Amino acid sequence: MKDYRLIADSGCDITAEDEEKYGIDIMPFDVTLGSETIRERVDISGVDFLKKITECEEIPKTSQITEFRFEEKFEECVKDGVKDVIVILINGAGSHTYANAVNAAEHMKEDGRAGDTRFHIFDSHTYSLGYGYPLVEAARKLEAGQSMDTVLGWLEDWFDSCELYLMLFN
């Protein structure tokens, strides 16, 4: 059993293979397409999700991951004896998800539920593979034996200097 856990939201767009290979926990966003609400990566595959978006006449709406859901996930980590929890999330300026994770960790520390578990929560300031890529790289580095402090420093440097350019296509 690893003494660390990596967690991200489903906006990171990593492959299911990397998710499984590195034991990364993906917390899904709820997405409303028309009158239907689905949980990304749970109720629908990435390919089917993209197809649904192109067929939907309305702009999809997403719902932030709640503080309550983060507390549930963090409590699971504590129960499993995880020492360090790295959480990498979608741009905090575009979603309240990051703030909810920070609040959940702070509440757990304040009331003692965190125990000795340390939470390292990153606002990626990016979208999609702008934080999915460093998430997988962090997993690779940890599996290769790099220290937690080294990987945390690398992630801080990445998110402090990352620039993301998007190209739209149809």
Question: Which residue stretches match the model-derived regions?
Answer:
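Internal, active-site/partner-interface "lid" segment
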Residues: A139-N170
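Conserved active-site and cofactor/substrate-binding residues in soluble primary-metabolism enzymes
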Residues: I44, D48, I65-R69, D80, ...
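Acidic/polar active-site rim loop that often engages polyanionic ligands
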Residues: A114-R118, Y131-R140
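Short glycine-rich or small-residue beta-strand-to-loop segments that form or flank ligand, phosphate
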Residues: D84-G92, H120-D123, E137
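Short, acidic/small-residue loops that bind anionic groups at enzyme active sites
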Residues: A105-S128, S147-M148
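Short Gly/Thr/Asp-enriched flexible loops that form oxyanion-binding sites at enzyme active sites
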Residues: L89-G112, Y133-L135
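N-terminal glycine-rich anion-binding loop in soluble enzyme alpha/beta folds
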Residues: R5-E71
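Glycine-rich phosphate/diphosphate-binding loops that line cofactor/substrate pockets in enzymes
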Residues: E72-D84
